[in-house]
């Protein structure tokens, strides 16, 4: 009897151990929540980073020439623009399953080429197509592009969409403009057809990185060639101020979530010229950072406590503490980190 019980206990113990090990392996394979997503451009890979440890927990193929990345609202999917520029003019958007941590079949955009800027809003994916001078919208539910609108501008590069979905903003690099695209009011009895009006505002040579203030009142746009920031009043659609900044080759510009500060990265390199922080109200420089090399993508955590900045020239992502205004850590990445995204999975 004792021998049978011992055998039974040994078998049960082995089963329990197996279940525990399986659970441990399953937990280890989970994408952390929250997670930092980093595009390693030259490696054509997506790195998934655990912000708690600053370690890469997985890498997933990101398709050819990945530039920008955005996550779906539920944090389950990531979309990556495969750019190609003027030479190869690619026409795909890579899709990554962040739960399974694997690449899904890419979105084929057909004649729409050189996709770059991305925004996910209202359950749909907005994108720019530079070759065609347009913005488009992809519906994941129908797996089709359901809307396209021309900007008439050269190198329509980055895109942002208002929460109300009735206002869209783009930066147009070679035209040196910001486009404000607004939905026209539909007259009663005119049917379901919607029309849009486009206003283009001069914003400096090589306008690329831009952001809309959290209150929706201003657009701040950085000029890569002029080393300036143009401030645009959204209501009047006019540039109200141009600020000189101490960053060369400006690449990205982001407001903090509370709208009090603005971070601007630069690819120009040089000591003290990789990242600058401005006070939004006073328009004054608060701090300059020397990150060791040209800086690109910027993403901030929702509570505004820290920012992550891709230091493309040094194959790392810097962590900037926005309370102490100091660099508090870094993530070692693959070659040429660029686009960044923050994922907070819904429970």
Regions found by a protein language model. Give the residues of each.
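Predominantly soluble domains enriched in secretory-pathway, periplasmic, or organellar proteins
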Residues: 20-347
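Bacterial N-terminal signal peptides that target proteins for export
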Residues: 2-15
């Amino acid at each position: 009897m004792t021998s049978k019980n011992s055998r039974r206990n040994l078998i049960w113990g082995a089963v329990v151990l197996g279940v525990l090990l399986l659970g441990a392996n399953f937990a280890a394979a989970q994408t952390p929540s929250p997670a930092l997503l980093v595009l390693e451009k030259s490696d054509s890979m997506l790195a998934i980073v655990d912000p708690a440890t600053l370690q890469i927990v997985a890498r997933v193929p990101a398709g050819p020439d990945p530039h920008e990345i955005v996550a779906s609202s539920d944090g389950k999917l990531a979309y990556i623009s495969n750019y190609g520029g003027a030479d190869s003019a690619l026409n795909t958007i890579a899709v990554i399953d962040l739960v399974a941590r694997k690449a899904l079949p890419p979105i084929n955009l057909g004649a729409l080429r050189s996709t770059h800027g991305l925004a996910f809003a209202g359950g749909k994916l907005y994108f720019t197509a530079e070759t065609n001078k347009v913005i488009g919208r992809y519906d994941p539910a129908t797996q089709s592009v359901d809307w396209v609108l021309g900007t008439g501008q050269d190198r329509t590069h980055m895109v942002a969409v208002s929460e109300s979905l009735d206002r869209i903003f783009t930066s147009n690099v070679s035209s040196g403009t910001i486009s404000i695209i607004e939905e026209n009011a539909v007259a009663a009895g005119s049917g379901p057809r919607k029309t849009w009006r486009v206003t283009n505002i001069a914003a400096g040579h090589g306008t690329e990185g831009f952001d809309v203030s959290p209150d929706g009142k201003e657009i701040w746009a950085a000029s890569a060639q002029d080393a300036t920031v143009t401030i645009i009043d959204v209501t009047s659609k006019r540039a109200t101020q141009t600020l000189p900044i101490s960053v060369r080759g400006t690449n990205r510009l982001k407001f903090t979530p509370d709208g009090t500060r603005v971070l601007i990265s630069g690819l120009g390199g040089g000591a003290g010229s990789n990242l600058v922080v401005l006070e939004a109200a006073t328009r004054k420089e608060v701090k300059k950072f020397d990150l060791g090399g040209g800086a690109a993508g910027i993403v901030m955590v929702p509570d505004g406590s820290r920012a992550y900045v891709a230091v493309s020239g040094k194959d790392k992502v810097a962590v900037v503490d926005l309370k102490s205004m100091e660099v508090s850590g870094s993530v070692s990445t693959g070659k040429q980190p660029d686009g960044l995204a923050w994922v907070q999975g819904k429970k």
